[in-house]
């Protein structure tokens, strides 16, 4: 009886992990394909700290489900920002997107 219960518990855990992974994959897909305009588009750049985001006075967009801090530039960085190209998203999301893209290839 105990073995049956443990087996059932393992199956439930596996089902939960698979469902969670599919949910994350949908979020990554939304990040890649669905964008909306940022607040203040074309005024301050992609976030409150325009210099840090290397996007001064250029239009920017955000993933559909995100906050402004995850904006991306729609035009190349200002020439004075060369070598400091803006991260499109926070480092952890950027890492996950890279892994997601590699897994599709």
From Swiss-Prot:
- Its protein name is U1-sicaritoxin-Li1b
> What family does this chain come from, according to its entry?
Belongs to the neurotoxin 28 (Litx) family.
Which residues does the record list as Arginine amide (modified residue)?
82
Q: Which organism is it from?
A: Loxosceles intermedia (Brown spider)
Q: What does UniProt give as GO cellular component?
A: extracellular region
Q: What is known of its domains?
A: The presence of a 'disulfide through disulfide knot' structurally defines this protein as a knottin.
Query: Residue span of the signal peptide, if any?
Result: 1-19
Residue positions assigned to the propeptide: 20-36, 86-105
GO terms assigned for molecular function: ion channel regulator activity; toxin activity
| General function of this protein | Toxin active against insects (S.frugiperda larvae). May act on sodium (Nav) or calcium (Cav) channels.
Q: In which tissues is it expressed?
A: Expressed by the venom gland.
Disulphide bridges in this chain?
38-55, 46-60, 54-73, 62-71
**Signal recorded as keyword:** yes
| Main localization, broad class | secreted
Keywords of the record, alphabetical order, are: Amidation, Cleavage on pair of basic residues, Disulfide bond, Ion channel impairing toxin, Knottin, Neurotoxin, Secreted, Signal, Toxin
Task: Tell whether Transcription regulation is among the UniProt keywords.
Answer: no
User: Which subcellular locations apply to this protein?
Assistant: Secreted
